[in-house]
C-alpha cells in the first residue's frame, strides 16, 4: 500500500512500509503461572476481558498486591500500551487506560515508539486485512495461538504522524456515531418489548392495558384453529 484510495485533502506523501517491530519499543506477553483472585487489588486481565475494543473491567478479576509486585515488567503494561489477545479468542485489541494492571499469557503487550501512535496502530490492526493476516498466521490445534514472533514481522503501512492523528479522529467519530445509534436502537427494542406486553390483553383479560384512542370493545377469546388452517408439512 503506497497510498490509500481515499485520503484527507492536503496529504500526498507515500505511506511507508515498515515491519511492526520497527514501530515498537516492546512486544511481549504476560505471566504463565496461576495467580490468586482477590476482592480488590490490581486488575488481572485475560483474553476474555478484552471486548469491543476495550478492557471489560466488569468481567476482569483482581489479584493480590504482593503477587502483582512479584511479576516482571513484561506482565505489567503501562497506560497507553496496546493489548492484543493471542490465545483462544484472537486479534482483539484494547489500549490500557488504568494503572496497576497485569496480563496473563493469553494477552500480548505492544508498546509503540515515536514512529507510530498507539491509537493509529489499534485502528490499523482492527482492519479486516490485518485481522485476517493474524488469523492466517495463527498456529495450534483446537485452540489457536497468535505468535508475537510473527506479529512483529508483519508489514504495516505508516503515514506521517499528522495523518495518523486525522485517521484516528475520523474513525473515533464513526465509533461514537455507531454507539449513539446502537443506544437508540436498544431503546427502541426496549420500547417494543414493553408495548408488546401492554398492548395485548394479559392473563385472560378482555382489553389491553394500553390501547389506541377510539377502541373500547372487549377482545374476543378464540382458539387459533378457528382462525387459521394448520397443516403438517
What residue ranges belong to the model's regions?
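Short amphipathic coiled-coil heptad-repeat segments
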Residues: 1-12, 183-217
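A short glycine-rich beta-alpha junction/loop motif
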Residues: 2, 86, 101-108, 139-163
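Proline-centric
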Residues: 9-14, 109-118, 149-168
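Non-catalytic DNA-recognition/assembly elements of restriction-modification systems
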Residues: 9-29, 211-233
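DNA target-recognition patches
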Residues: 21-25, 34-67, 102, 225-228
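A short beta-sheet element
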Residues: 46-48, 57-130
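Secondary-structure capping and domain/repeat boundary segments
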Residues: 73, 118-159, 200
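Extracellular/lumenal glycan-associated surfaces
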Residues: 163-177, 181-183, 220-222, 226
Amino acid at each position: 500500500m503506497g497510498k490509500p484510495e481515499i485520503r484527507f485533502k492536503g496529504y500526498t506523501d507515500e505511506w511507508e512500509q515498515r515491519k511492526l517491530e520497527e514501530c515498537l519499543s516492546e512486544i511481549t506477553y504476560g505471566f504463565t503461572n496461576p495467580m490468586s483472585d482477590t476482592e480488590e487489588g490490581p486488575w488481572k486481565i485475560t483474553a476474555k476481558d478484552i471486548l469491543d475494543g476495550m478492557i471489560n473491567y466488569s468481567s476482569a478479576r483482581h489479584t493480590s498486591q504482593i503477587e502483582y509486585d512479584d511479576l516482571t515488567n513484561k506482565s505489567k503494561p503501562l497506560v497507553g500500551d496496546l493489548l492484543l489477545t493471542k490465545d483462544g479468542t484472537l486479534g482483539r485489541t484494547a489500549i490500557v487506560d488504568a494503572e496497576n494492571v497485569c496480563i496473563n499469557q493469553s494477552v500480548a503487550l505492544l508498546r509503540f515508539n515515536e514512529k507510530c501512535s498507539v491509537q493509529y496502530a489499534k485502528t490499523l490492526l482492527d482492519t479486516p486485512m490485518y485481522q485476517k493476516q493474524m488469523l492466517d498466521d495463527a498456529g495450534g490445534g483446537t485452540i489457536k495461538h497468535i505468535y508475537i514472533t510473527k506479529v512483529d514481522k508483519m508489514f504495516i503501512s505508516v503515514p506521517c504522524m499528522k495523518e495518523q492523528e486525522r485517521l484516528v479522529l475520523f474513525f473515533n467519530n464513526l465509533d461514537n456515531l455507531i454507539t449513539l445509534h446502537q443506544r437508540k436502537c436498544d431503546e427502541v427494542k426496549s420500547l417494543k418489548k414493553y408495548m408488546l406486553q401492554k398492548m395485548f390483553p394479559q392473563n385472560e383479560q378482555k382489553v389491553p392495558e394500553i390501547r389506541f384512542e377510539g377502541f373500547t370493545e372487549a377482545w374476543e377469546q378464540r382458539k387459533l384453529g378457528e382462525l387459521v388452517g394448520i397443516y403438517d408439512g
